[in-house]
Each structure stands twice: as structure tokens, then as C-alpha cells.
């Protein structure tokens, strides 16, 4: 089952509206009858239901699906449905919700419907096996309705008038002989009685199709009969009616086929075709040979009485009615009819539908009884046409098609949808009759009279048939005078006044002036006046028009085809872009092929080149900025790396010039002492100048932030420059200084506690043991091992009471709880980790934090809050540390530097300095120590502490800085701090680079 075109267009459009409250849970998922949307979502229909394609969303119907129809969706309605679906979707409703079903059903109720023939009606097996399957298609209700109708109206047949009157239907030529081979047998006996009676009914209210399509005839009351009728029964007319009724059915015992004479719409609510232009009311047969005798009159009254008694039975079957009709026919037909008496004229579509639904033998012509009273049959003929005219004009309920007259605007919808393949083989070879032009195909006249169309093809032919508009009197007369045919039925094209053409443009919305200009150009192109087009309207980007009646016999299809063929000329004349043109019969679009739009590739080429140019410009600018920045850093690195080689007078002169400029603007009362010798004592560093508060020790040390906050004087920078010059003049100075540092021996250096047997498993390296006088003491009562030992040393800076750092080894699996206990008891908030977890398969540090969630280490619960990777060199983790004994919680931040390996140095000083700035920015304003650890807590940890301590002294405004003396101060508190000469040289380079950045940031 393919999706309809309007729905495909609806899904391609883009989607905004306030979100409403979601539907209650009770409103979801309930199986309701007739649910919509089964084409788009499975499971909507119940087990006894099937999904019927209604042309929009699909509707669930009980099996068998009888009420089949399609909606006619105009472009405006399609846009409205799209907006409704957007609202429901954004609000959270689905097809399962009752609210969705009610909203969509309400919207669809406003759309016009086109009723379809039942899908099984076109099955050849059904038509060929009518006798075996008819019990499946007719319910007992139709038989009861027939019996009640006979019981109500047969007594009133005695009111038929006997007096012949003048021809009451002058519009139709009654003397015209019926077309040979046509079947005029009515659908049932009631239709024949209605056609041959002079009953008149008040105008029936036009009821909505198809609810009252099969309105019971019993609604008419006896007092509705016209008082004009006489009180006596016209026996000849009743005889003719009953005779024709019985004659139309093939004889045979136990023949159930007369059931097909009951209205076929009882099978399924199919759309009935309104009486076509060529339809004529059936005529009784012509002159009969024998007249009725008085015995026949008596017999007739007796049979009518028996028939009325039979009608009293509520469950009277149609087979019994046929038996009664056989009895009447047997009494009438005293002599067989000789010669071929052909059936008289038939309706255009209703009779052909009988041929399609009836078995094959029902397509043959049947003879009607002949009576020898020509006057009686003449009167029957006159009354028949008069009654037919009255029923047509007043919409009698006897005609199921009457309610359809007010919906004549749907006449073209099914016709436009019918593909050429669905047409019967007769129409493919015989051609099509045009009602207005009265032209007939030559091939049709040459067809053999006995050719029998295939019943299933005939049903397919009329499956998409829609009710026609009744023409004026002249057209009705012409339609009644159709040419003879051999039992075939011509397809009638819809009238041109009912077709709408459209031209779709690229302007949305299209102004009415532009639309009128476009139609004027089309009229000029066709060499017709502007009045040639009627009812010109602009709908969105399209112009909709109708083609008036014209002597050129030009149709809407001709106009739309001309618009397609001359598309370029129209676009040039109007300045519009024509996208499509086609025929629009009442909301359904029949598109015509037209040349595809040739996309202007020039604009895409221009846009492509512009995009490429922009991308290249951005890349070029980025590359230039990177090169400039990299070049400046490269030059600085070259200067620093050449300190031990060829001396550079440029660097020295630059630093000295900066110093002179800085000194020139200083107050005159400030005097500096001579810098003639280096200070080697630790006491001179610790006692120099007033000390700021402990909270001021933190420094961001950033090239953009730290110099602005630094208290370092230009003279300090000059001192650092002089220190570097001293190393440059004496190439072996750095190595000798390192040898002196290696020979330095701390006093005291006792490590008895760390060497105890119970503490030996807690040491990662025997070369780095804590001094007894400088170690972190844990509270043994809170320790899981009841010990106060951990391999960690406090590092003092300027305040011997408050350590600035805690240098410790990387935790072992057995010391993780001790590590977190030290973090808690020291009040630490920042951890600096300078080692990866493993190097070349050697474990450097235990994974002492959870990867996700939380872990408990003794009485401390560590919860990982976040983990951010700042760059490829380091990342930052945030923890919640909770003491399960006191239920207190603190926040701890870990800075993990990844690219510094054991006994080595980082690849660049820049990455470590940037890492230090991040650490100090987080630490700013705190007075707690920073825990620094690597693997053994000495080499990499000592280098980092040395760099940070020297730079912090410079930021506080220290007048004298001695890096070697500072390292000795660190080794007094923990052995092995800065383990290699490369690490010491790296510390000097990092300090020099940071000083250089500070000097550049100072105001000139």
C-alpha cells in the first residue's frame, strides 16, 4: 500500500509552537474503533481490523472494510494538516493518544470525501462466482426492508390513474427506439413499480452522502401521495411491470441469482453514479399480441393479495418474491413472444454497473411479456417518463443517486485519478465520448453487438467513476438520442467547466497582479481573449483558472500543455519562474510533465570559490600567527640554550637597557647596595625584607597575569641576568656548582624511624627516606595500621611553623589509606602529581583514586566529581573527600602532569610553567600546604618545588635570589631533592624564562 503524494509532500517540509502539557497516561494506547494513522505506525488497528488507505493517514476499519473513501486534500488543507501535526509532535503526542485521534478526526471531517468502490468488487473471481458467494454479500435486513416496502406501497398501486394524458415529458423523444442490445431491466421490482407509477412525492431533503444512500423506502407515508391520483388501479401497467421484472432474470430452479436485483449497494457502500446525460427511464415493451382477459384480471388480483400476505412475513426472502413474480408472469404470458424484441434504452452508469456485478448470463438481453393493448403500454410509457422527470427534479428518495446531486463538483475527481491501464479494453479501442462535442469513435460503431465485455474490467472501469452534473435541457435531449451501440457503454469525460487548471510559479506568495499578467500572456500566446479564462484566482504561488466554453473546443489540458511547451517564453515575458502546470479537479492535482529546471551552476561555482578563499584566508592567518609566536619562543630558547656556549652581547645589553630604563624612573631616595658577591647563606634569603602575609605567597605566574601582580623589582631581574652572565663567562661554573650540591650533607640526617622493620614496606625507594626531624606524623588512633609513619616530608619556605609543601612518594597499594589520611589531617586541597602511573612497564604510582563513582579507603570515601583534560601534557581531577567518622566533606583538586618521566625533564619549560600557573591559580588565597609527589618524591618533586619557591620569592619582591642555596635548603628537609644535573639546569632555564616574561610585561 503506497503512501499518497500529499503525505510525502507533508513529510518533506521543515518544522515551531509552544509545548503543551502531555496527555495523561490513561489517554495512551487504548484501541478505539476507526483509529487514524495506521499507514505510519503499526499496531494501531485491532486484531479484527484492517488498515484502509484513505489518501491521508490511513484508517482502521473492521473486516470487511465497507466504508471506503478517500479525502480530497487541497494545498491549503495540506499545509494546515502539517501545522497540526507539528503541534501534536512537539507537544509529545503520538498516534496512540486519544487526543491526537480526536484532533485529526475533527480536521478530516472538514475535508470532502470521494467514495470508492469496494476493493473486492473488481475481483474476477467474485463476479464469476456470484451464485456461490451471494449469501456473503446480502444480509437479511435487505430482505426485510423489501418485504416491508412491498407491504406498504403495493396497496397504494390501486390509486393509479387510468386516464391517459398528454405527454408530460416533452424534453425526451419517446418514440425513439431503444438502442439495440441495451439492457433496461431494473434493479428490482420496487424500481419498476416506481418507474411505472404516477406517484408524486414532495421534494426530499438532500441528505448527506453516504449515510442515507440506502434510505429505506418505508419512510414515505401514505399521506404524502399526491391527491391527483385516481382510486382505481391500472392493471395493464402493473402487469407490464411485474412481467418485465420476472423476464429480466434467467429461468431455473433454485436459482438464487434474483438476489442481485435487490439494491447492490447493500454489499458495500459504493458511490452511486448519478443519472448520466444519456440516461433514459426504462420503457415497457411495445405492442403486445394478446390482450388480457377477465380471468387474467381476477388472477392478477388474487396474486396481488397473496403477495401482500407474503409481505407480512418479517423475514420474507427474495427467493419467495421471485416465485410470486414467476406466478404472475406465468399468468400474463399466455403465448410465447416471437421474433427478437430487443431491450430498450438504459442508463449510462447505473445499468452498466448491474452488468458488472451480475453473473455473466445476466449480461444477455431478455424479452419482456407482450400484451395486445397498445394504449395501455403507451400510457405506461408516458407515466414512466413523467415519474422519472419528477424523481430527477425533486430528488426522490426512490433514487439512491438523488442525494448526490448537490455534490456534483466531485464529478472529475475519480476521473482524473484513473490511470489509462484501468480503462476497459472496450474503451482502449473504441475511444471516449465527449458530452459537449457529441463525437463518437468510429471503431465503436463497428463493434459486434454480441461482444461481451469482461465483467471485472467493467467494474474497474467504473471504480473511479464520480457523479456527473446534470446538464441543461438541450444537453439532456441530445444525450437521450445517443447513437446505437452493440451493448457497450461509453466513458463520459467530465465537463470542462468542472476542471481547473493551475500554473505553479516560484514566487510564494504570488501577487494577484502577477497572476493576472501571467494569464494575459497565456491568452496572448493562445491568441484568445482574456475572458477565455474564467474564475482566475491566486493561491499561494499558483494561479488557478477555468477554461470557458469556446468555439475552438479548447480544453484545460490544452492550456496547461501549452504553458509547459512555452515555459521559457512565458518566463521571459512575465519575469516569473514556472515550476509546474496541470489540471486540478476539486483538490486533486493532475500534473503534466515539463522540462526539469536547469539549475544555474554559476552561482554554486562562485559560492564554492568564495568558501575556499575564506578557508584559505583563515588557514593563512592562523599559520602566520603560529609562526610569529613560535619564532619568538624559538629565539628565546636559542638565547637560553646558548648560555653555556658562545656569549651573546645582544641579550646582555637588552637586559641591561631594561634595567637602566627601570632605574631611571625610580625614586631618588631609593638606593641599592652594591651587588658584588653572591649570597650563599640560607639565612640571608630568609631574613631579607619584610615578609608579606602567608596568603600572599600564591602566585599565578602567568605571562599575562603574574607580572601585573608581581612585586619583583627591576633590580632583581638585573641580578638574575648577572647570575646568568657569570655562568656564561665560566663554562664549567654550572658543573662545578652541581658537584658542590652533590657533596652537600644535611645536618641532622638521621632516618631511624623510616628504617624500622614495620615501616620498611611503606617505603618505595630506600634512597629516599624521611628525616626523623622532618617527617609528617599521622594520628595513629585514626590509622588503619595504628602507625604514625608515612614517607612524606614537610617543606618550609619562610615560615617554619607552616609548611608550604609536602613532598611525598607515590602511594603504594598498602599506603593509599595513609595517603588520604595525610590529605585530610593536613587540610590539603591541592595535589600535584608529576608522574604517569607506569613507565615502560614499571609501576611508578598506585591508582589511588576512583575511575568513576566513589571508593572507600579505611574511613575516607573518595568520590570522583570531574576530570578535565587541559592539554596533552596534563589534566585536572576534582574529588569529594568525606570522613565517614565525622561525615565531613571537603573538595580536593588533583593536577596530574603526564609528560615528565623518571630521571628526565619535560620536553619544554613552557608546558611546566603553564601547569604551574594552573596550580597556583587554584591555590590562590589558601594557606594549606600543597602535596607534591612523583614516584619517590624527590627528583621531579624537588625540581618543581625549587622552581615554584624561587619564582614565589621573586614575586614577593625578594632582593637577592640564590637558586643553589635554595636547593640546599630543600635538601635539609628531604634527601635527594633534584636528582640530576639536567633537572637542575632545567630549573635554571625555567626561572630565566619566567623572569624574561615578567620583565617584558613591566611598563616601559
UniProtKB/Swiss-Prot annotation:
For bias kind Polar residues, which ranges apply?
677-687
Site, Cleavage: residue positions: 415-416
Protein name listed in UniProt? Receptor-type tyrosine-protein phosphatase N2
Q: Which Pfam families would you find in this protein's record?
A: Receptor_IA-2, Y_phosphatase
Protein family (similarity comment): Belongs to the protein-tyrosine phosphatase family. Receptor class 8 subfamily.
Question: What does the record's free text say on domains?
Answer: The tyrosine-based internalization signal is proposed to function at the level of clathrin-mediated endocytosis and recycling.
How would you summarize the oligomeric state and partners of this protein? Self-associates. Interacts (via cytoplasmic domain) with PTPRN (via cytoplasmic domain). Interacts (precursor form) with CPE. Interacts with HAP1. Interacts with AP2A1 or AP2A2 and AP1G1; indicative for an association with adaptor protein complex 2 (AP-2) and adaptor protein complex 1 (AP-1). Interacts with AP2M1; indicative for an association with adaptor protein complex 2 (AP-2). Interacts with MYO5A.
- Give the principal location in a single coarse category: membrane
What gene, per UniProt, encodes this protein? Ptprn2
- GO aspect biological process, one term: neurotransmitter secretion
Q: Which organism is it from?
A: Rattus norvegicus (Rat)
Can you provide one Gene Ontology molecular function annotated for this UniProt record?
protein tyrosine phosphatase activity
